[in-house]
Amino acid sequence: MNSKDEQFELYKKEQLKKLADRIKELRIKKGYTSYEYFAYDHNIPRAQYGRYEKGEDLKFSSLLKVLQGLDISLKEFFEEGF
């Protein structure tokens, strides 16, 4: 792997961690102490949602579904926490 690839992988990992932290922060603000209850209430597979909060890559459509459950727009999500 060349230097640019390594830099990108590091950047991607950092950004996914920020995304995960933001999702978790908003879930807790909504009153969900457990990610499992949030996932269940919003019809998102629990294991899959758990991976999102751990910083694994997710599809854009999956992010939109999570944001719908959090009752926040894409714009608000990125303005306030990024």
Segments and roles (model prediction):
Residues 1-30:
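A short, Lys/Arg-rich alpha-helix, primarily the initiator
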Residues 53, 70, 81:
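DNA major-groove recognition helix of helix-turn-helix
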Residues 45-48, 59, 73:
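Short coil turns linking two alpha-helices in DNA-binding domains
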Residues 61-76:
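DNA major-groove recognition helix of helix-turn-helix/homeodomain DNA-binding modules
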Residues 27, 39, 67:
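The alpha-helix within a helix-turn-helix
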Residues 31-51:
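Short alpha-helical DNA-recognition segment
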Residues 21, 32-34, 58-61:
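Residue-level signal for the short linker/turn that defines the boundary of a DNA-recognition helix
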